[in-house]
Amino acid sequence: MGKRLLDKLWERHVVTTNENGLDLLYIDLHLVHEVTSPQAFEGLRLTNRTVRRPDLTFATMDHNIPTKDVWNITDRIAKQQLDTLRENCKQFQVPLADIGDEEQGIVHVIGPELGLTQPGKTIVCGDSHTATHGAFGALAFGIGTSEVEHVLATQTLWQRKPKAMGIELKGKLQKGVYAKDIILHLLSKYGVAVGTGYVMEFYGETIGTMEMEERMTLCNMAIEGGAKAGIIAPDEKTFAYVKGRKYAPRDYETFEKKWFELYTDADAIYDLHISIDVTDLAPYVTWGTNPSMGVRIDEKLPEKHDVNDERAFSYMGLIPGQSTYDIPVQHVFIGSCTNSRLSDLEIAASVVKGRKVKEGVRALVVPGSKRVRDAAMQKGLHHIFEEAGFEWREPGCSMCLGMNPDQVPEGEHCASTSNRNFEGRQGKGARTHLVSPAMAAAAALYGHFVDIRKESYDGAISYS
């Protein structure tokens, strides 16, 4: 019987197996940020250990930093975490993309754009959305702080092999429908626990038409379905994306030959299989307090089915049967490790070009990295956004989570391109609606959700 992509990635990294069936995996890349690393580094200090492979470790600052004035850090705890990461990286000789550095940005944005993320690697980070890197045919997953310490000290990690889920995507997306809508559809249909105990492998003709940044969006939110990771077999688009980047292999051709072997064999069998035809998918909007509580833009909100629905409706200030078009939007956030890359900003800019943000709506665009910001500014996207009434910010996690100054006031609604809509995720009492960049941009113009498919935009930007 053939092997799944998961099998090939896993077997290449097993150092040994213990009597309990746990495998000791070698880790090829360890990404670090300021929130989940302080105790891990302190653990090394207390046991008089060093970082085993600083050359396979890379740190950045993203979660806590302000995006309006990056040097004015008024939160004492945030400043302490940033200062601590800076000191830890210096002491343990770990490369750091500090505030203001050209390589700084959200950890799951800079990994791919710097060429650190590569097919065939095992990649970990003390962050649940590490699954993003699986878009490159890497086995990438989030870990806890104690595991961060273990990887720093040994460059290995004890893990139990998950099962493999195949998610086949067939058909062509309509204009105005994106990878974000696919994953929100998957979650709304199958729930937030469908992937528990599995690694999701996305494949099929739809994947072949997607660019790398769309694939990253898919894998990024695999964790929202309970999966250990999301993966996509590398192809020519993957190789073209990696080639020439700063940390890409110097002996690129040799590595590329090995990467061509990373696919699921034709006679391999998944432990669970799901097939989705994307042809008739519509843009999605979440209405509740987990990512599975979502509906098509052309559907009404569902009826209450259980106590969780009742609590969600109450928290969100919505009612069953309400039209999605009637959901008010006071804030718009375009950013996060899900949708803050150049193509995301280009799509949003194409929607708002020559138009104005609705009075009373606060709209933020936060590039995922310094390089994304610079590239967008070279194309004049910042002018398009600012002329429309958006705030153009510095890179960081920003309004994705309430750990920095960018927060949504209590009781107000935010159209967000991020990945989580839990109670209080964007601030105490904040009401989060997950959508694509195009849908978020359109909501900023109207002050409520609209069907982006009916808007006259071409999905691309003219720079003339």
From Swiss-Prot:
InterPro entries according to UniProt: 3-IsopropMal_deHydase_lsu, Acnase/IPM_dHydase_lsu_aba_1/3, Acoase/IPM_deHydtase_lsu_aba, Aconitase_4Fe-4S_BS, Aconitase_4Fe-4S_dom, IPM_dehydratase_rel_enz, IPMI_cat
Reaction equations catalysed: (2R,3S)-3-isopropylmalate = (2S)-2-isopropylmalate
Enzyme Commission number, as recorded: 4.2.1.33
Pathway: Amino-acid biosynthesis; L-leucine biosynthesis; L-leucine from 3-methyl-2-oxobutanoate: step 2/4
One GO term (biological process): L-leucine biosynthetic process
Pfam families reported for this sequence: Aconitase (PF00330)
Entry keyword set: 4Fe-4S, Amino-acid biosynthesis, Branched-chain amino acid biosynthesis, Iron, Iron-sulfur, Leucine biosynthesis, Lyase, Metal-binding
Positions bound to [4Fe-4S] cluster: C337, C397, C400
Entry cofactors: [4Fe-4S] cluster
SUPFAM superfamilies attached to this UniProt entry: Aconitase iron-sulfur domain
Cofactor binding remark: Binds 1 [4Fe-4S] cluster per subunit.
Presence of the UniProt keyword Glycoprotein in the record: no
Family named by the database record: Belongs to the aconitase/IPM isomerase family. LeuC type 1 subfamily.
NCBIfam families: leuC, PRK05478.1, PRK12466.1
Function (record text): Catalyzes the isomerization between 2-isopropylmalate and 3-isopropylmalate, via the formation of 2-isopropylmaleate.
Subunit note: Heterodimer of LeuC and LeuD.
HAMAP family: LeuC_type1
The protein's name: 3-isopropylmalate dehydratase large subunit
Species name: Bacillus anthracis
Gene: leuC
